[in-house]
Amino acid sequence: SDQAAQLVQFLSTFFRKNLKRPSEIVTLADEIEHVNAYLQIEKARFQSRLQVSLSVPDDLAYQHLPAFTLQPIVENAIKHGTSQLLGSGEIMISASRFNRHLVLDIEDNAGLYEASASGGLGMSLVDKRLRAHFGDDCGITVACEPDRYTRITLRLPLEENAC
């Protein structure tokens, strides 16, 4: 079927990105392609129970960031957030500029984040990698309104001439 063929294509993209990333640093466009393949696989699993929106302005597509920055955060949002909902889950990913930073927001509509769990190992590792690579001005912050949303915000330096 067409759906099975599409799923195989997304699996192929996801595994290729996992195995053959050319370097530790990738473009935001490449990272979004990787996370979108992952999201399409999850959408096949959850079907109409998972809605996804991506909002990345073209002028930010060539900003650089460490590979595998978004996928662990998105995986947490599904595993600890939307998959726990009885109704439909939503994952929203957006990129914007704020002052001299690239700001990436990953938000779910579950609002189930527990500070004691610290978001798990994946989120902690991403935060440590961002801070080690870019300094303590960068990293992850979490905002949660119980039963409404959890928003993970990643701050990275903005490259003025990325293209």
Where are these regions (language model features)?
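Two-component histidine phosphotransfer core
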Residues: 1-143, 149-155
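Generic C-terminal helix-cap and adjacent flexible tail
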Residues: 157-163
